[in-house]
Amino acid sequence: MEKLFIAAGLFVGLVCLVKCMRFSQHLFLRFCKALPSSFLRSMGQWAVITGAGDGIGKAYSFELARHGLNVVLISRTLEKLQTIAEEIERTTGSCVKIVQADFTREDIYDHIKEHLEGLEIGILVNNVGMLPSFFPSHFLSTSGESQNLIHCNITSVVKMTQLVLKHMESRRKGLILNISSGAALRPWPLYSLYSASKAFVYTFSKALSVEYRDKGIIIQVLTPYSISTPMTKYLNNKMTKTADEFVKESLKYVTIGAESCGCLAHEIIAIILNRIPSRIFYSSTAQRFLLTRYSDYLKRNISNR
Protein backbone atom coordinates (compact mmCIF):
# COMPACT_ATOMS: atom_id res chain seq x y z
CA MET A 1 0.00 0.00 0.00
CA GLU A 2 2.87 2.35 0.83
CA LYS A 3 4.40 1.77 -2.61
CA LEU A 4 1.04 2.54 -4.21
CA PHE A 5 0.83 5.89 -2.42
CA ILE A 6 4.42 6.69 -3.40
CA ALA A 7 3.69 5.84 -7.05
CA ALA A 8 0.53 7.96 -6.98
CA GLY A 9 2.45 10.85 -5.45
CA LEU A 10 5.18 10.61 -8.07
CA PHE A 11 2.58 10.54 -10.84
CA VAL A 12 0.80 13.63 -9.50
CA GLY A 13 4.14 15.37 -9.12
CA LEU A 14 5.08 14.53 -12.71
CA VAL A 15 1.77 15.88 -14.01
CA CYS A 16 2.27 19.11 -12.06
CA LEU A 17 5.83 19.41 -13.38
CA VAL A 18 4.66 19.03 -16.99
CA LYS A 19 1.98 21.69 -16.48
CA CYS A 20 4.51 24.03 -14.85
CA MET A 21 6.91 23.53 -17.77
CA ARG A 22 4.15 24.31 -20.28
CA PHE A 23 3.17 27.44 -18.34
CA SER A 24 6.82 28.51 -18.14
CA GLN A 25 7.18 28.10 -21.90
CA HIS A 26 4.17 30.35 -22.47
CA LEU A 27 5.55 32.87 -19.99
CA PHE A 28 8.96 32.95 -21.71
CA LEU A 29 7.56 33.28 -25.23
CA ARG A 30 5.00 35.86 -24.12
CA PHE A 31 7.55 38.28 -22.71
CA CYS A 32 11.04 37.27 -23.87
CA LYS A 33 11.08 35.78 -27.35
CA ALA A 34 8.99 36.66 -30.38
CA LEU A 35 8.54 34.21 -33.24
CA PRO A 36 10.13 35.77 -36.34
CA SER A 37 7.91 36.50 -39.33
CA SER A 38 10.33 34.48 -41.44
CA PHE A 39 9.22 31.30 -39.64
CA LEU A 40 5.60 31.66 -40.73
CA ARG A 41 6.64 32.66 -44.26
CA SER A 42 8.90 29.62 -44.46
CA MET A 43 5.85 27.34 -44.24
CA GLY A 44 4.68 28.38 -47.71
CA GLN A 45 3.36 31.28 -49.75
CA TRP A 46 -0.33 31.04 -48.83
CA ALA A 47 -2.41 30.78 -45.65
CA VAL A 48 -5.99 29.51 -45.75
CA ILE A 49 -8.43 30.72 -43.09
CA THR A 50 -11.97 29.42 -42.61
CA GLY A 51 -14.59 31.60 -40.96
CA ALA A 52 -12.59 34.62 -42.10
CA GLY A 53 -15.50 37.05 -42.18
CA ASP A 54 -15.54 37.87 -38.46
CA GLY A 55 -13.80 37.55 -35.14
CA ILE A 56 -10.83 35.24 -34.77
CA GLY A 57 -10.77 34.22 -38.44
CA LYS A 58 -10.70 37.82 -39.60
CA ALA A 59 -7.92 38.60 -37.12
CA TYR A 60 -5.80 35.66 -38.35
CA SER A 61 -6.31 36.84 -41.94
CA PHE A 62 -4.90 40.28 -41.20
CA GLU A 63 -2.10 39.08 -38.92
CA LEU A 64 -0.81 36.41 -41.31
CA ALA A 65 -0.91 38.93 -44.15
CA ARG A 66 1.14 41.32 -41.99
CA HIS A 67 3.67 38.50 -41.58
CA GLY A 68 4.07 38.42 -45.36
CA LEU A 69 1.78 35.57 -46.41
CA ASN A 70 -0.85 35.71 -49.12
CA VAL A 71 -4.23 34.67 -47.73
CA VAL A 72 -7.28 32.72 -48.86
CA LEU A 73 -10.38 33.86 -47.00
CA ILE A 74 -13.27 31.41 -46.80
CA SER A 75 -16.62 32.35 -45.30
CA ARG A 76 -20.34 32.55 -46.00
CA THR A 77 -20.96 36.26 -46.60
CA LEU A 78 -19.43 37.52 -49.85
CA GLU A 79 -19.78 41.22 -49.01
CA LYS A 80 -17.79 40.83 -45.79
CA LEU A 81 -15.07 38.88 -47.59
CA GLN A 82 -14.77 41.52 -50.31
CA THR A 83 -14.46 44.33 -47.75
CA ILE A 84 -11.83 42.46 -45.72
CA ALA A 85 -9.88 41.47 -48.84
CA GLU A 86 -9.71 45.07 -50.04
CA GLU A 87 -8.46 46.28 -46.66
CA ILE A 88 -5.82 43.52 -46.39
CA GLU A 89 -4.48 44.25 -49.87
CA ARG A 90 -4.44 47.99 -49.18
CA THR A 91 -2.76 47.81 -45.77
CA THR A 92 -0.35 44.88 -46.19
CA GLY A 93 0.30 44.48 -49.91
CA SER A 94 -0.42 40.74 -49.70
CA CYS A 95 -2.46 38.95 -52.35
CA VAL A 96 -5.93 37.83 -51.28
CA LYS A 97 -8.27 35.20 -52.71
CA ILE A 98 -11.84 34.90 -51.45
CA VAL A 99 -14.04 31.80 -51.49
CA GLN A 100 -17.70 32.04 -50.58
CA ALA A 101 -18.78 28.85 -48.80
CA ASP A 102 -21.37 27.91 -46.19
CA PHE A 103 -19.76 25.39 -43.83
CA THR A 104 -23.12 24.15 -42.58
CA ARG A 105 -23.38 22.37 -45.96
CA GLU A 106 -21.54 19.22 -47.05
CA ASP A 107 -21.40 19.93 -50.79
CA ILE A 108 -18.92 22.82 -50.71
CA TYR A 109 -15.55 21.07 -50.72
CA ASP A 110 -15.15 20.45 -54.44
CA HIS A 111 -15.79 24.17 -54.92
CA ILE A 112 -13.16 25.05 -52.31
CA LYS A 113 -10.68 22.56 -53.78
CA GLU A 114 -10.93 24.24 -57.20
CA HIS A 115 -9.97 27.60 -55.67
CA LEU A 116 -6.98 26.10 -53.84
CA GLU A 117 -5.51 24.29 -56.86
CA GLY A 118 -1.93 25.30 -57.63
CA LEU A 119 -1.37 27.30 -54.43
CA GLU A 120 1.61 26.60 -52.18
CA ILE A 121 -0.36 26.45 -48.94
CA GLY A 122 1.85 26.65 -45.89
CA ILE A 123 -0.70 27.45 -43.17
CA LEU A 124 -4.27 26.32 -42.57
CA VAL A 125 -6.40 27.88 -39.83
CA ASN A 126 -9.50 25.78 -39.17
CA ASN A 127 -11.44 28.46 -37.35
CA VAL A 128 -15.04 28.35 -38.55
CA GLY A 129 -17.53 27.34 -35.86
CA MET A 130 -20.96 27.99 -34.42
CA LEU A 131 -22.91 27.78 -31.17
CA PRO A 132 -26.30 26.01 -31.11
CA SER A 133 -27.47 28.56 -28.55
CA PHE A 134 -25.79 31.66 -27.20
CA PHE A 135 -27.22 31.15 -23.72
CA PRO A 136 -26.62 27.98 -21.67
CA SER A 137 -29.53 25.61 -22.21
CA HIS A 138 -30.52 21.96 -22.05
CA PHE A 139 -29.90 19.90 -25.17
CA LEU A 140 -33.58 19.55 -26.15
CA SER A 141 -34.14 23.29 -25.66
CA THR A 142 -31.73 24.29 -28.44
CA SER A 143 -32.95 25.42 -31.83
CA GLY A 144 -32.59 22.08 -33.61
CA GLU A 145 -29.56 23.05 -35.72
CA SER A 146 -27.52 20.08 -34.51
CA GLN A 147 -26.65 18.85 -38.01
CA ASN A 148 -25.54 22.33 -39.06
CA LEU A 149 -23.29 22.51 -36.02
CA ILE A 150 -21.76 19.10 -36.76
CA HIS A 151 -21.02 20.14 -40.36
CA CYS A 152 -19.59 23.50 -39.28
CA ASN A 153 -17.58 22.49 -36.21
CA ILE A 154 -16.49 18.95 -37.10
CA THR A 155 -16.86 18.16 -40.81
CA SER A 156 -15.13 21.41 -41.81
CA VAL A 157 -12.00 20.52 -39.82
CA VAL A 158 -11.79 17.02 -41.30
CA LYS A 159 -12.46 18.05 -44.91
CA MET A 160 -10.22 21.13 -44.95
CA THR A 161 -7.40 19.15 -43.35
CA GLN A 162 -7.77 16.46 -46.02
CA LEU A 163 -7.59 19.08 -48.77
CA VAL A 164 -4.43 20.73 -47.49
CA LEU A 165 -2.47 18.13 -45.51
CA LYS A 166 -1.45 15.88 -48.43
CA HIS A 167 0.28 18.81 -50.16
CA MET A 168 2.04 19.76 -46.92
CA GLU A 169 3.18 16.15 -46.57
CA SER A 170 4.70 16.15 -50.06
CA ARG A 171 6.57 19.39 -49.25
CA ARG A 172 7.45 18.15 -45.73
CA LYS A 173 6.46 21.40 -44.09
CA GLY A 174 3.32 23.19 -42.97
CA LEU A 175 1.35 24.55 -40.04
CA ILE A 176 -2.25 23.69 -39.17
CA LEU A 177 -3.99 25.59 -36.37
CA ASN A 178 -7.29 24.08 -35.27
CA ILE A 179 -9.40 26.39 -33.13
CA SER A 180 -11.13 24.34 -30.45
CA SER A 181 -12.27 25.72 -27.08
CA GLY A 182 -11.62 25.48 -23.38
CA ALA A 183 -15.01 23.74 -23.32
CA ALA A 184 -13.28 20.79 -25.03
CA LEU A 185 -11.11 20.01 -22.02
CA ARG A 186 -13.98 18.56 -19.98
CA PRO A 187 -17.68 17.98 -20.74
CA TRP A 188 -19.71 21.19 -20.29
CA PRO A 189 -23.36 20.59 -19.42
CA LEU A 190 -25.75 23.18 -20.91
CA TYR A 191 -23.32 23.55 -23.80
CA SER A 192 -23.27 19.79 -24.42
CA LEU A 193 -23.25 19.67 -28.23
CA TYR A 194 -20.82 22.57 -28.63
CA SER A 195 -18.49 21.09 -25.99
CA ALA A 196 -18.60 17.66 -27.64
CA SER A 197 -17.89 19.10 -31.10
CA LYS A 198 -14.88 21.00 -29.80
CA ALA A 199 -13.68 17.88 -27.95
CA PHE A 200 -13.60 16.14 -31.34
CA VAL A 201 -11.41 18.94 -32.73
CA TYR A 202 -9.15 18.61 -29.69
CA THR A 203 -8.62 14.83 -29.88
CA PHE A 204 -8.43 14.77 -33.69
CA SER A 205 -5.75 17.47 -33.66
CA LYS A 206 -3.68 15.85 -30.93
CA ALA A 207 -3.69 12.51 -32.75
CA LEU A 208 -2.79 14.10 -36.11
CA SER A 209 0.05 16.00 -34.46
CA VAL A 210 1.68 12.71 -33.47
CA GLU A 211 1.09 11.16 -36.91
CA TYR A 212 2.68 14.01 -38.88
CA ARG A 213 5.24 15.62 -36.59
CA ASP A 214 8.08 13.57 -38.13
CA LYS A 215 7.07 14.85 -41.57
CA GLY A 216 7.83 18.47 -40.78
CA ILE A 217 4.20 19.46 -40.18
CA ILE A 218 3.10 21.31 -37.04
CA ILE A 219 -0.50 20.61 -36.03
CA GLN A 220 -1.61 22.54 -32.98
CA VAL A 221 -5.02 22.75 -31.31
CA LEU A 222 -5.95 25.97 -29.54
CA THR A 223 -8.30 25.84 -26.55
CA PRO A 224 -9.18 29.45 -25.65
CA TYR A 225 -11.83 30.43 -23.16
CA SER A 226 -13.56 33.81 -23.47
CA ILE A 227 -12.74 35.80 -26.62
CA SER A 228 -14.66 38.96 -27.49
CA THR A 229 -16.16 38.25 -30.93
CA PRO A 230 -19.51 38.80 -32.68
CA MET A 231 -20.38 35.15 -31.92
CA THR A 232 -19.62 35.21 -28.18
CA LYS A 233 -20.57 38.85 -27.48
CA TYR A 234 -18.22 38.91 -24.48
CA LEU A 235 -16.87 42.28 -23.33
CA ASN A 236 -13.09 42.31 -23.34
CA ASN A 237 -11.12 42.70 -20.11
CA LYS A 238 -7.90 41.35 -18.59
CA MET A 239 -8.97 37.73 -19.09
CA THR A 240 -11.31 38.13 -22.06
CA LYS A 241 -9.15 38.98 -25.05
CA THR A 242 -10.19 40.71 -28.23
CA ALA A 243 -9.77 38.60 -31.35
CA ASP A 244 -6.77 40.71 -32.42
CA GLU A 245 -5.07 40.36 -29.03
CA PHE A 246 -5.64 36.62 -28.95
CA VAL A 247 -4.36 36.00 -32.48
CA LYS A 248 -1.20 38.09 -32.09
CA GLU A 249 -0.30 36.27 -28.89
CA SER A 250 -1.28 32.80 -30.12
CA LEU A 251 1.14 33.01 -33.05
CA LYS A 252 4.00 33.29 -30.56
CA TYR A 253 3.23 29.77 -29.35
CA VAL A 254 2.94 27.77 -32.57
CA THR A 255 6.20 25.91 -31.85
CA ILE A 256 5.35 25.14 -28.23
CA GLY A 257 3.68 21.79 -28.87
CA ALA A 258 0.45 20.13 -29.93
CA GLU A 259 -1.76 22.14 -27.59
CA SER A 260 -2.05 25.72 -26.36
CA CYS A 261 -4.75 27.90 -24.85
CA GLY A 262 -3.44 30.60 -27.17
CA CYS A 263 -2.70 33.21 -24.53
CA LEU A 264 -1.15 33.32 -21.08
CA ALA A 265 -4.35 34.54 -19.40
CA HIS A 266 -6.25 31.49 -20.62
CA GLU A 267 -3.48 29.14 -19.50
CA ILE A 268 -4.13 30.52 -16.01
CA ILE A 269 -7.90 30.00 -16.40
CA ALA A 270 -7.30 26.41 -17.53
CA ILE A 271 -5.12 25.67 -14.50
CA ILE A 272 -7.80 27.03 -12.15
CA LEU A 273 -10.75 25.27 -13.81
CA ASN A 274 -8.92 21.95 -13.98
CA ARG A 275 -8.46 22.10 -10.21
CA ILE A 276 -12.23 22.21 -9.60
CA PRO A 277 -13.38 18.71 -8.57
CA SER A 278 -15.93 17.09 -10.86
CA ARG A 279 -18.44 16.69 -8.03
CA ILE A 280 -18.50 20.49 -7.71
CA PHE A 281 -18.26 21.33 -11.41
CA TYR A 282 -21.16 19.02 -12.26
CA SER A 283 -23.26 19.77 -9.19
CA SER A 284 -26.85 21.01 -9.41
CA THR A 285 -25.73 24.29 -7.84
CA ALA A 286 -23.20 24.89 -10.62
CA GLN A 287 -25.79 24.13 -13.29
CA ARG A 288 -28.31 26.52 -11.69
CA PHE A 289 -25.59 29.17 -11.68
CA LEU A 290 -25.07 28.73 -15.42
CA LEU A 291 -28.79 28.87 -16.15
CA THR A 292 -29.45 31.97 -14.05
CA ARG A 293 -26.57 34.23 -13.08
CA TYR A 294 -24.33 33.41 -16.03
CA SER A 295 -27.25 33.94 -18.42
CA ASP A 296 -27.91 37.31 -16.77
CA TYR A 297 -24.23 38.20 -17.21
CA LEU A 298 -24.44 37.39 -20.93
CA LYS A 299 -27.59 39.50 -21.30
CA ARG A 300 -25.83 42.45 -19.68
CA ASN A 301 -22.93 41.99 -22.08
CA ILE A 302 -25.30 42.17 -25.04
CA SER A 303 -27.00 45.31 -23.74
CA ASN A 304 -23.65 47.02 -23.08
CA ARG A 305 -22.08 46.31 -26.49
Swiss-Prot record:
Expression sites (tissue/organ): Expressed in the testes.
This protein's GO CC annotations: endoplasmic reticulum; endoplasmic reticulum membrane
EC numbers: 1.1.1.62, 1.1.1.64
Disrupted gene: phenotype observed: Null males have increased circulating luteinizing hormone (LH) levels. Null males present mild hypogonadism at adulthood represented by lowered weight of testes and several other androgen-sensitive tissues, a shortened anogenital distance, delayed puberty, and subfertility (fewer litters). No phenotypic alterations in the null female.
Compartment(s): Endoplasmic reticulum
EC class of the enzyme, as a word: oxidoreductase
Catalytic activity: a 17beta-hydroxy steroid + NADP(+) = a 17-oxo steroid + NADPH + H(+); testosterone + NADP(+) = androst-4-ene-3,17-dione + NADPH + H(+); 17beta-estradiol + NADP(+) = estrone + NADPH + H(+); 3beta-hydroxyandrost-5-en-17-one + NADPH + H(+) = androst-5-en-3beta,17beta-diol + NADP(+)
InterPro entries: NAD(P)-bd_dom_sf (IPR036291), Sc_DH/Rdtase_CS (IPR020904), SDR_fam (IPR002347), VLCFA-Steroid_DH (IPR051019)
Keywords: Endoplasmic reticulum, Lipid biosynthesis, Lipid metabolism, NADP, Oxidoreductase, Steroid biosynthesis
GO molecular function list: estradiol 17-beta-dehydrogenase [NAD(P)+] activity; testosterone 17-beta-dehydrogenase (NADP+) activity; testosterone dehydrogenase [NAD(P)+] activity
SUPFAM superfamilies to which the protein is assigned, alphabetical: NAD(P)-binding Rossmann-fold domains
Main location: endoplasmic reticulum
GO BP terms in the entry: androgen biosynthetic process; testosterone biosynthetic process
Listed Pfam families: adh_short
Binding sites annotated in the UniProt record for substrate: S181
Keyword Nucleotidyltransferase: no
Active-site residues, as the UniProt record annotates them: Y194
Pathway(s) served: Hormone biosynthesis; testosterone biosynthesis; Steroid metabolism
Positions that bind NADP(+): 44-73
Function: Catalyzes the conversion of 17-oxosteroids to 17beta-hydroxysteroids. Favors the reduction of androstenedione to testosterone. Testosterone is the key androgen driving male development and function. Uses NADPH while the two other EDH17B enzymes use NADH.
Homology family: Belongs to the short-chain dehydrogenases/reductases (SDR) family. 17-beta-HSD 3 subfamily.
Designated name of the protein: 17-beta-hydroxysteroid dehydrogenase type 3
Species, as recorded: Mus musculus (Mouse)
